[in-house]
Amino acid sequence: KEGLIPLLDKIRAAGRPDLSALEGTYDIDAQKKVQNLLLSYIGFDFDAGGTAESAHPFTATLCRGDIRVTNHYHETHPISSIFSAIHEGGHAIFEQNIDSSLADTAAETVNLMGLHESQSRFYENILGRRPAFWIPIYGKLGGLLPQFKEVPFDTFCRAINDVHPSYIRTEADEVTYCLHIILRYEMEKAIFR
């Protein structure tokens, strides 16, 4: 916390990038196609799972070989569904890659939150926010969301790494996300003293 707050202040003082090129209305069905493109790109096996829409993104393991990824879509904010798809895809890939030799053992249901979140956040933030991740598929993104054809690649990369505090943890950037966790911990600690 002591290091994050001064860093956040420094970033805020530098100003936000111009994100006006991303403004507009984005077709929900097109966003669903983007989700499927991204899930396929990161290795989600559609023969062992599927997708659905929900109010809050989540991944559910119905049984071995049936992992469901859900997402939410905002007509004016496609970046949200893009990163929810990558994040939930990370959860799903983790589940899809539990070795079949572990079937019907306690190890098969290794649903430890730390393991799951490490995988999903690795896909979302370590891979998904790097320009190198997008180079092979950015043109396809523009094919599905025509507005992106007008968005220079560098502008897109700045947009997906923009630091902007949010009241919603799952919509927070990589700097302020940690502050959500710290604040929750401090509140819980104070409640149970």
For the regions a language model picked out, list residue spans one by one.
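Contiguous, non-catalytic segments that form substrate-binding/exosite surfaces or channel walls
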Residues: 1-78
